[in-house]
Amino acid sequence: MRIPKAFLSVLLLILCINGCSQDPPTIPDDPQALTGTNDGIASAIASEALVLTTWECVEPVTVDASALAKTGCVPRIVSYDRLPLGGGIVHYRFHIRVGAGSHDIIGLHRVIKETGHCKPAKTKDAIFLQHGDAKDFEGMFLPFTRSTHMPDGFGLATYLAASDVDVWGIDQPWTLVPSGTTDFTFMKDWGLQRNIDDLRTGMAIARALRLATGFGNDKLILLGYSSGGMTGYATLNHETQVPTRERQVRGFIPADILFKSNDPAIHRAFAYDRSLYEPSYAAGVYQAPIPFALVGSLARTDPSGDSPVIPGLTNLQTALYFACGQIFASDVSIHYLAGYMDATGFPIDLRLVTLPQWFDFLEAGVPYQACKFFMDYDAVIADIGDPPFDDHLSEVRVPVLNLGTKGGLGPYTLYGTTLLGSNDITHRIIEIGTGDVLTEFAHIDLFLAPQAPTLAWQPMLTWLRAHRN
């Protein structure tokens, strides 16, 4: 997801592991990484996680001491939860230290059926989910856990788990930075490469745990939503340059996101977006405030009050514009949710998602995001400079399901896929037939709309099953 330009302008101006027992992990004289990864963090964290979860271990975990030493930190699990979600599905949640800094922490999630307490059911399919801007794993893929107005159990992660998929996912470190933080110097270098590195670490840990518990060592299908899809594309680009055994991804689902474009309007929109961040970043402001929670709260509690975010609109109008307006540019049709418009083209109601559901979704947004991440992917899309994240797209050979929405980024996603080297690319652009792209099924409908399971998730599941390793 992107942050509407009107919001950005105002806010930026204001700112100017033992495996099968509890014995110590084995460190051999000549350590070797787990097959498929040379990441010492993965083996160390997998070893610790097996103790905490009591998952049955069938393949001993060997900690790669030499690789671990190169990380310059002692990786560890900071917190762990096991959360039953109903229907025999359980959510395992970890916060994992992956670096020496106080904020070098990722979230790792697993949503899966159980056959008994702490006994994950064996599955033939697995997927790893990467969220986009402004949201974390639960807010995007388990939205019912953050809303009293969503149907119980509603979310892509639970849908797939109920269909016998082993679902994993990540919280990027910026989602875990608490509100009220004042010193953001740690965010200075949190750009697209940092996202790539943390995503690959999360996937390596997931694969190490799957191997240790008898699920095999297959690489994973990766779904990247919105800017998470940017991270996904950049990860595929990165993995073309590492040995095959160290790659994590074997298939990719970019969910309503473009990576490259030949559309001048898209170039202008993302170049302008980058220009909003450049002055503040140069002045030492490395965080971008996320207005989701403020907009949702004011729309719920004071709908007719004057908006402090978009002057001239009420709080409710701001939330509606945020949902259904052309938030990128007037010549770009992208919007978040399908809606209804008045005679002037201004949104007056939501078409598929309810207003209380939308307010809940907004209020569950994270407070901050890293400016450099925005700037890096804006540069890739707008062809600014020579970023390294798109240099090897023609070498990407994995199968791809390009899953888009008619009212979101779907129409703009096709060009980028033509730059890939894969001969297995499927396109599915979802629409509901409103007759107007500006009121169509859109970017966030993909994960919130009641029609999403039928229109998007079931076709995704079919593709996933067709691409079993």
Regions from the language model: what does each represent?
Residues L12-T54:
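Bacterial Sec-dependent N-terminal signal peptides
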Residues L68-K122:
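N-terminal cap/lid segment of alpha/beta-hydrolase-fold proteins
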Residues T115-D171:
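Short, surface-exposed "cap/lid" segments of acyl-processing enzymes
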Residues M187-L211:
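Alpha/beta-hydrolase active-site loop
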Residues A212-S226:
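Alpha/beta-hydrolase fold nucleophile elbow
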Residues H267-P411:
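Alpha/beta-hydrolase
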Residues L403-F441:
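Conserved loop-alpha-helix segment in the C-terminal half of the alpha/beta-hydrolase fold
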Residues R428-N469:
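Catalytic active-site module of serine/aspartate enzymes centered on a nucleophile-bearing elbow/loop
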